[in-house]
Amino acid sequence: MSCNSVLVWLTDARSVDTAQFPRFESWLSATEAARYGRFRRPLRQRQFLLGRAMLRLAMGQMLGLPPAGITLEERPGQAPLLLAPPAGPYFSIAHSGSWIACAVSSEAALGLDIEVCDPHRDVLALALQAFGAAVSDELAAMPQPARTAVFYQRWSASEAAYKLGQDAGSSVTLAHPALSIVLCSAAPLAQPPVLRVTTLASGDFL
């Protein structure tokens, strides 16, 4: 178990052994299983399952509990509610494309966002729509690939703050070659968050 108070776990769904899926499905609560069964797109279904499995593995590592001992309940339009253990850690889940991430903290409420950085998207038009002309003009003055990187960092920061749902005490950008990753917390963190990449093998969470 790490001494860091905030861990951000990241997986590429393409790297996860599908033989693990039945075990992950057995961890789902009744409300989670119902939602899981309603997904029609395989990618979205996989994002959901792996996100909940990774969250349970991460919480279990932090608390010294088996993943099956973590009970979550679905809430329409909101993050899942942690029912057991009743005094569990703060958490946030995010996904983009084949990538899924979760953050867990013993310190403060979290908001996490990840985005696949697509250099082919018209980030100037997206910035104009999302942030206004000033930001779009600022990006237009930048060379590539900095323009794309800065846009996605701003986008992730905005989404992470929205997920947090309150003023952020800190906002941290985590480096990754393919993704923009931003973690907001309700209070300043005692230590910087640590990013760990996993295939969701149980040995990764020892």
Features from the language model and the residues they span:
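Core catalytic alpha/beta fold that binds nucleotide/phospho-ligands
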Residues: 1-206
